[in-house]
Amino acid sequence: MGTTLFSPEQIAALSAPLDRAKVQTRSQAGRSLAYLEGWQAIAEANRIFGFDGWQRETVAVQCVAERERTLGSSNRAGWGVPHTARVRIRDREVIREGSGAGHGIDADLGQAHESAIKEAETDAMKRALITFGNPFGLALYDKQQRQVSGNGR
């Protein structure tokens, strides 16, 4: 076996089950989806790697489209703007990348772009972090969620 870049404490934290209290759910296309919020993923990275032990870098952001649309029940004029992003996570010598998408909807075109970019970057960051293990949501990909502990809130 080779040497590891992580301390025994970090390996234990990365191998531990995901705490169900940190998991959120939402309904999408008639299904219930479990996920970690972006701030929770950042908090876990800070806890496991240290506040100064990891870096997040946006490698690319791209606007996919820009469409005028109506907003809400009032049918106000607005914009729908999807973006994609690629983010790189670096913990010392370990580098992971993730891709994500975001969709901004707002009456103001600039606000729609800002919202889409933030959502795409957060999605990409979470996808990069998930490759480190359960504390970042990897356990949620198992339909039985065998590596998710606790009863939730």
Predicted stretch roles:
Residues 4-9, 36, 41-152:
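Positively charged, aromatic-enriched nucleic acid-contacting surfaces
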Residues 1-42:
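N-terminal, Lys/Arg- and Ser/Thr-rich interaction peptides
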